[in-house]
């Protein structure tokens, strides 16, 4: 209850204070100031005496605003002809003063000191005439003569001299120079040129010839050497290569041949055996022995028959990506289509030219133990999920 009364009393006090702000006075806090400002308009004739203001505390109240104006030069006497018509008299006086000021500005300035000299001076004469100038100057002389010109010029000199001539001409130069000589002579040309050089040299000679070429080259060398020879030939190649080697080697040989292949295989040593993978006359005992040697660990290289069967299985799935390994344990093969042959129909792909092959090796082979182990683990996981 007391709280409500306190709030009501405070709000009533504030309401009453807001209604009667004009009658508040704070004793010594009142401050009165009178401003007397003199202000002239643009013509400089009207004087203002204004702005009398009173201030009370924080509230600013203007109780009076006095504005008195009078005209400067105004006379209350009856003799003044402008007394009855103040504004018209002011305008007339103002125009008269402005007219007198303009006339004063227009008056020419005269030199009060009399200057001796010719009274008929040319008004267009040059005021900066040289007092030491030659009085006998040729009136027809060139006004644009170079002041730094040579005073000892030859009077018989050629008047048509080339203005762009070389000023540094050799005075001892040959006067009988060939007028048809090449003006673009190489300034860096060799001054020690052989005077007996061949004048019919090949104009199409190679300008980038090797300056360190062998001067003792074989003069009987083949002039029709292969222009497409490999420029990156091995500089350390065997100089004792077989001169009777087969010049018709297979250009489509596999560039990815196994570098660790066995050099003692029967079908490769001494050029014996058959090289075709599908040759029906292949030594059957050779393949049989190879299969029997690695039957237990399944680590033998994939045979041609295995590769052919694998290609038939994945023929419809071949792409430019490597296929999965053909085996799950041991050595197998992966196949993909070469990027350049990707647009060919799959039934027209060539085994040698359109397919890439590589050997893959599966290290971890599946066994019965692995299958049982995986089954037990799966059962344990399922039982844990469903029983809980």
From Swiss-Prot:
<feature type="compositionally biased region" description="Polar residues">
    <location>
        <begin position="265"/>
        <end position="280"/>
    </location>
</feature>
<keyword id="KW-0732">Signal</keyword>
<keyword id="KW-1015">Disulfide bond</keyword>
<feature type="repeat" description="37">
    <location>
        <begin position="260"/>
        <end position="263"/>
    </location>
</feature>
<feature type="glycosylation site" description="O-linked (Fuc) threonine">
    <location>
        <position position="328"/>
    </location>
</feature>
<feature type="repeat" description="21">
    <location>
        <begin position="196"/>
        <end position="199"/>
    </location>
</feature>
<feature type="compositionally biased region" description="Low complexity">
    <location>
        <begin position="114"/>
        <end position="264"/>
    </location>
</feature>
<feature type="repeat" description="34">
    <location>
        <begin position="248"/>
        <end position="251"/>
    </location>
</feature>
<dbReference type="Pfam" id="PF00090">
    <property type="entry name" value="TSP_1"/>
</dbReference>
<feature type="repeat" description="22">
    <location>
        <begin position="200"/>
        <end position="203"/>
    </location>
</feature>
<feature type="repeat" description="15">
    <location>
        <begin position="176"/>
        <end position="179"/>
    </location>
</feature>
<feature type="compositionally biased region" description="Acidic residues">
    <location>
        <begin position="74"/>
        <end position="90"/>
    </location>
</feature>
<feature type="repeat" description="23">
    <location>
        <begin position="204"/>
        <end position="207"/>
    </location>
</feature>
<feature type="compositionally biased region" description="Basic residues">
    <location>
        <begin position="95"/>
        <end position="113"/>
    </location>
</feature>
<feature type="repeat" description="28">
    <location>
        <begin position="224"/>
        <end position="227"/>
    </location>
</feature>
<feature type="repeat" description="2">
    <location>
        <begin position="124"/>
        <end position="127"/>
    </location>
</feature>
<keyword id="KW-0472">Membrane</keyword>
<dbReference type="GO" id="GO:0005886">
    <property type="term" value="C:plasma membrane"/>
</dbReference>
<feature type="region of interest" description="Disordered">
    <location>
        <begin position="71"/>
        <end position="302"/>
    </location>
</feature>
<keyword id="KW-0325">Glycoprotein</keyword>
<feature type="repeat" description="10">
    <location>
        <begin position="156"/>
        <end position="159"/>
    </location>
</feature>
<feature type="repeat" description="16">
    <location>
        <begin position="180"/>
        <end position="183"/>
    </location>
</feature>
<feature type="repeat" description="7">
    <location>
        <begin position="144"/>
        <end position="147"/>
    </location>
</feature>
<dbReference type="GO" id="GO:0009986">
    <property type="term" value="C:cell surface"/>
</dbReference>
<feature type="repeat" description="11">
    <location>
        <begin position="160"/>
        <end position="163"/>
    </location>
</feature>
<dbReference type="InterPro" id="IPR036383">
    <property type="entry name" value="TSP1_rpt_sf"/>
</dbReference>
<keyword id="KW-0748">Sporozoite</keyword>
<feature type="repeat" description="27">
    <location>
        <begin position="220"/>
        <end position="223"/>
    </location>
</feature>
<feature type="repeat" description="26">
    <location>
        <begin position="216"/>
        <end position="219"/>
    </location>
</feature>
<feature type="signal peptide">
    <location>
        <begin position="1"/>
        <end position="18"/>
    </location>
</feature>
<dbReference type="InterPro" id="IPR051860">
    <property type="entry name" value="Plasmodium_CSP_Invasion"/>
</dbReference>
<feature type="domain" description="TSP type-1">
    <location>
        <begin position="313"/>
        <end position="366"/>
    </location>
</feature>
<feature type="repeat" description="12">
    <location>
        <begin position="164"/>
        <end position="167"/>
    </location>
</feature>
<keyword id="KW-0461">Malaria</keyword>
<feature type="repeat" description="31">
    <location>
        <begin position="236"/>
        <end position="239"/>
    </location>
</feature>
<feature type="lipid moiety-binding region" description="GPI-anchor amidated cysteine">
    <location>
        <position position="365"/>
    </location>
</feature>
<dbReference type="InterPro" id="IPR003067">
    <property type="entry name" value="Crcmsprzoite"/>
</dbReference>
<feature type="repeat" description="33">
    <location>
        <begin position="244"/>
        <end position="247"/>
    </location>
</feature>
<feature type="repeat" description="30">
    <location>
        <begin position="232"/>
        <end position="235"/>
    </location>
</feature>
<comment type="similarity">
    <text>Belongs to the plasmodium circumsporozoite protein family.</text>
</comment>
<feature type="repeat" description="8">
    <location>
        <begin position="148"/>
        <end position="151"/>
    </location>
</feature>
<feature type="repeat" description="3">
    <location>
        <begin position="128"/>
        <end position="131"/>
    </location>
</feature>
């Amino acid at each position: 209850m007391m709280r409500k009364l306190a709030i009501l009393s405070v709000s009533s006090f504030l309401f009453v204070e807001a209604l009667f702000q004009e009658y508040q006075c704070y004793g010594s806090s009142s401050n009165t100031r009178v401003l007397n400002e003199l202000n002239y308009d643009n013509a400089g004739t009207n004087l203002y005496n204004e702005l009398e203001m009173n201030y009370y505390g924080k509230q600013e109240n203007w109780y009076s605003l006095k504005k008195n104006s009078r005209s400067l030069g105004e006379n209350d006497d009856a003799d003044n002809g402008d007394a009855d018509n103040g504004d018209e008299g002011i305008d007339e006086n103002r125009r008269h003063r402005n007219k007198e000021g303009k006339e004063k500005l227009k008056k020419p300035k005269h030199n009060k000191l009399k200057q001796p000299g010719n009274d008929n001076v040319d008004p267009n004469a040059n005021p900066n005439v040289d007092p030491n100038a030659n009085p006998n100057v040729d009136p027809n002389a060139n006004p644009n003569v170079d002041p730094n010109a040579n005073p000892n010029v030859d009077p018989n000199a050629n008047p048509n001299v080339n203005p762009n001539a070389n000023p540094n001409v050799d005075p001892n130069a040959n006067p009988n120079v060939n007028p048809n000589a090449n003006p673009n002579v190489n300034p860096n040309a060799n001054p020690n040129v052989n005077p007996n050089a061949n004048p019919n040299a090949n104009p199409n000679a190679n300008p980038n010839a090797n300056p360190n070429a062998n001067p003792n080259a074989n003069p009987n060398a083949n002039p029709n050497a292969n222009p497409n020879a490999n420029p990156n030939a091995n500089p350390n190649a065997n100089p004792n290569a077989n001169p009777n080697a087969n010049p018709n080697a297979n250009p489509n040989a596999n560039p990815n041949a196994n570098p660790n292949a066995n050099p003692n295989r029967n079908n490769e040593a001494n050029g014996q055996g058959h090289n075709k993978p599908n040759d029906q006359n292949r030594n059957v005992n050779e393949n049989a022995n190879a299969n029997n040697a690695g039957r237990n660990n399944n680590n033998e290289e994939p045979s041609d028959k295995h590769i052919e069967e694998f290609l038939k299985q994945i023929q419809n799935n071949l792409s430019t990506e490597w296929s999965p390994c053909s085996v799950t344990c041991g050595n197998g093969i992966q196949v993909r289509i070469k990027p350049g042959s990707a647009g060919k129909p799959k039934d027209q792909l060539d085994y040698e030219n359109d397919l890439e092959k590589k050997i893959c090796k599966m290290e971890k082979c599946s066994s019965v133990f692995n299958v049982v182990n995986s089954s037990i683990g799966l059962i344990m996981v399922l039982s844990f999920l469903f029983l809980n």
